[in-house]
Amino acid sequence: MMKFAVPVFPGSNCDHDMVNALRDILHVTADLIPATATSLAGYDAVVLPGGFSYGDYLRSGAIARFAPIMPAVIAFANAGKPVIGICNGFQVLTEAGLLPGALQANRSAKFICQDSPLRIANHETIFTTAYGSTDQISLPIAHGEGNYYCDEATLAQLRANHQIIFEYVENPNGSTANIAGITNEAGNVLGMMPHPERAVEMILGSTDGLGIFQSVIASQEEVTHA
């Protein structure tokens, strides 16, 4: 059975939602890992959850990037293993240099909490294959600093390498090129502002978030059986 690690920083608040989605809905092993830990040995994937790590002082994710667990996360990613950063987790990944660009305050300068339609821009990743031919999904967003920014050279590289995975249909926050989620060039690290863990059962209003985790699980099963 696949094992997911969910690092918990002071101020994380979506960690239990993430573990619930993985354990109870997807029936895989998921453990909460304290930010003070220094090893991810034995795990197959890592998910950095949403929240307000270290109170989002300085910048969102800026202090979490220096947590004791982060060298292990960086090594995990550099080894080609799946890493997902959701909302604050995305911010941490950019601060850690695992993903390009940065997350700024929303253009409206207001916290946004709503469902947001997304276009799947690349179906051929370890995070999106389960969506098949589905072109559009809807996921909840909840952030004050979700406005993705990168310079023109970085945007050109993201497009050339097909690293833009999710795009807002109706850009809620001012993100460059409507970007809602990107991967690293190797394709094993995903950062996204929307919350797939909040869309995993119909009592929550949608199951559109399941495909991301189902894709990762399927990709690792292929590796195991290869």
Curated annotation (Swiss-Prot):
Alphabetical list of PROSITE patterns matching this protein: GATASE_TYPE_1
Key words, A-Z: ATP-binding, Cytoplasm, Glutamine amidotransferase, Hydrolase, Ligase, Nucleotide-binding, Purine biosynthesis
Source species of the chain: Lactiplantibacillus plantarum (strain ATCC BAA-793 / NCIMB 8826 / WCFS1)
Disulphide bond pairs: none
Recorded name of the encoding gene: purQ
InterPro entries: Class_I_gatase-like, PRibForGlyAmidine_synth_PurQ
Pathway involvement of the protein, from the record: Purine metabolism; IMP biosynthesis via de novo pathway; 5-amino-1-(5-phospho-D-ribosyl)imidazole from N(2)-formyl-N(1)-(5-phospho-D-ribosyl)glycinamide: step 1/2
Cellular location(s): Cytoplasm
Catalytic activities: N(2)-formyl-N(1)-(5-phospho-beta-D-ribosyl)glycinamide + L-glutamine + ATP + H2O = 2-formamido-N(1)-(5-O-phospho-beta-D-ribosyl)acetamidine + L-glutamate + ADP + phosphate + H(+); L-glutamine + H2O = L-glutamate + NH4(+)
Gene3D superfamilies, per database record: 3.40.50.880
Cellular component aspect of the GO annotation: cytoplasm
EC number: 6.3.5.3, 3.5.1.2
Protein name: Phosphoribosylformylglycinamidine synthase subunit PurQ
Annotated catalytic residues: 87 (nucleophile), 195, 197
GO molecular function terms listed in the Swiss-Prot or TrEMBL record: ATP binding; glutaminase activity; phosphoribosylformylglycinamidine synthase activity
Subunit structure and binding partners: Part of the FGAM synthase complex composed of 1 PurL, 1 PurQ and 2 PurS subunits.
Main location: cytoplasm
